[in-house]
Amino acid sequence: MADRTEQILTPSQLNTLARDLLEGSFPLVWVEAELGNVTRPASGHLYFTLKDARAQIRCAMFKPKSTWLKFQPREGLRVLARGRLTLYEARGDYQLVLDHMEEAGEGALRRAFEELRARLAAEGVFDAERKQPLPAHVRRLAVITSPSGAAVRDVLSVLARRFPLLEVDILPSLVQGDSAAAQITSLLQRADASGRYDVILITRGGGSLEDLWAFNDERLARAIAAAHTPVVSAVGHETDVSLSDFAADVRAPTPSVAAELLVPDQRELVARVRRAQARLSQLQQHTLGQAMQHADRLALRLRARSPQARPQLLQRRQEDAARHLRARMQHILERLQARVQRAQAGVQSHSPQRHLAPLQQRLRAAHPQAAMQRRLQQDHLHLRGLVRSLEAVSPLATVARGYAIVTRQADGSVVRSAAELTQGDRLRAQLADGSVTVVVDTSETG
């Protein structure tokens, strides 16, 4: 009894153990079956059963996931569902909580799509090195699409608004069904071979994977990759991806975006042209201004060399020479004045001030240049007389009369008395015509 008591569980405990066992054993499963008992309450969640001929399982797909379904779930529809097994503990219901669901036919198509994409990628069909850039200016555009679909209306509307001058050819084609891929491929090859177009756009609106299957055709993908003309693919909505998108030189998420990629906005072009015109005008004005300045310089040079300008040139040269001569004379006078001032300073150191005062007065009184020159000559003669007077009392004149100036040979000091000398002193005697060196033998005073 004790052993049995330890194994007794409550319903909630048992359901919890069962839930953990289910979720641990089946983390994620794929199920292909028919829909039944489809309900969608106000909460937005989706509840139904997946069934076959012998069994069924309760399923739930909550609103965040069910909102993205690309089809309307209905009774009897065969689907491929992915989810995790769990158990609703409150009722003990075993169920499958789904995060993805598609129509059963799409499951096979998607597997075929992935296999073909991997094979073409391995062959290098989708390599980025093979892709061509779009031309800067598209003049002629070929659009391969359904002539009655929403895609062609969107493309033409955007092109007309942004760049109405673009030449557009609509190449009508089926975009859905068994023969659509072959027709699109044929139109692409003919448009590429014509050499008429700058870009070829392949486009259609959104749809299911089966609706878009023509754009997953291997021959079409290879034709796009082999085209010499740049190809833009805009198939379905932004979440739809086809092999034509991988093979194309440029992939656009929607037809409208493709049209915007292909042509500039005419308003932006007008603004760019106006800015270019403004820069060109500025450049022209600058260039013209430089040319006019150069022409003015040449005209001045020509006028300077013309016969009419010769007298004026000579007159200017004469005036320049006169100014230079006056400046030169002024410089000479200033130098003479400086010499007189230096001579005055020398005379002041040897004679009374009265000898120079009259000279200074005469210099200050001499304003005209001619009078100044005559006065300078007179003063020069007077200075020569003063110099002769000074020379008469100069020590050199005394030496010339037979005397000598005796200095010590060691330091050059003048010997003024015999008492300053001792036996052996070496002396230098400066005579009128030279000097002699003597050695003191004896000295006598008195």
From Swiss-Prot:
EC number per UniProt: 3.1.11.6
Domain of life: Bacteria
Keywords associated with the record: Cytoplasm, Exonuclease, Hydrolase, Nuclease
A single cellular component GO annotation: cytoplasm
Keyword Coiled coil: no
Gene Ontology molecular function terms on file: exodeoxyribonuclease VII activity; nucleic acid binding
Location of the protein in the cell: Cytoplasm
GO BP annotations listed: DNA catabolic process
Role played: Bidirectionally degrades single-stranded DNA into large acid-insoluble oligonucleotides, which are then degraded further into small acid-soluble oligonucleotides.
Family: Belongs to the XseA family.
Protein name: Exodeoxyribonuclease 7 large subunit
Organism: Xanthomonas campestris pv. campestris (strain B100)
Gene: xseA
